[in-house]
Design a protein with these regions (language model features):
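Active-site-proximal helices and loops of the catalytic beta/alpha 8
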Residues: 65, 73-176, 181
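Hydrophobic positions within alpha-helical membrane elements
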Residues: 9, 77, 106, 192-194
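Short capping/connector residues at structural and topological boundaries
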Residues: 29, 47, 156-157, 171, ...
Length: 197
């Protein structure tokens, strides 16, 4: 089984702020926790926050013998922490699969640039894969044009772009291995594949 892990949707910022104020989240320069639509942005570059991520992944593999993880909003996390979690879990399961939503959503701490675990990271890793929104948008449409006609619903699309996506060469990011790219059309987000009227 592949588990869906959602480290970035904590609903309330207080969940971690009550443990240790101004630590577990990425912060603005004034000490305000950075948030997104799902709550606080978990500060995975902070030592104990990274440990929370890595240790919980290891625990799930060791205790429940899971085969892998799908990271919701993986692009919110730094690449080094996700890579460390993968390597730690792989010692327990050498066939571990790790993939995620590699959208370019990383906020980090203000004025502290760090490599995000997003689609742009795919040229640097062969251990973790990301979803290709390019193939989804061309075949059925998606954010930000959800519901607009696409290839399978009669919309005009460039067939060469679709073919490039089928061989793991999306047009919106570069990958150096086909295993870096998860081609998909529909998942738990957004509209269904197709609704008949």
């Amino acid at each position: 089984a592949i588990l869906d892990v959602v480290y970035n949707h904590t609903a309330k910022v207080d969940i971690f702020e009550d443990l240790e104020p101004n630590y577990y989240h990425f912060m603005d320069a004034d000490g305000t926790p950075r948030t997104s639509f799902g709550g606080g942005r978990l500060g995975t570059t902070h030592h104990m926050t990274k440990r929370l991520l890595v240790d919980s992944i290891k625990y799930l593999v060791d205790t429940y013998k899971v085969d892998g993880f799908r990271f919701d909003m993986m692009g919110d996390h730094d690449a080094a922490s996700v890579e460390e979690a993968y390597k730690a879990a792989r010692t327990l399961n050498p066939n571990l699969i790790m993939l995620g939503e590699g959208w370019r959503t990383y906020a980090g701490d203000e004025n502290m640039p760090t490599k995000a675990a997003d689609q742009d990271w795919m040229k640097k890793t062969d251990t973790v894969a990301v979803f290709s929104d390019d193939i989804r948008n061309n075949l059925k449409s998606g954010y930000p044009n959800e519901g607009q006609p696409a290839f399978i619903t009669g919309g005009k699309r460039d067939i060469n772009t679709i073919f490039k996506n089928l061989i793991a060469q999306p047009t919106n990011f570069e990958a150096d291995s086909p295993g870096d790219v998860i081609q998909y059309i529909a998942a738990h987000d957004n509209l269904t594949l197709f609704d008949r009227s």
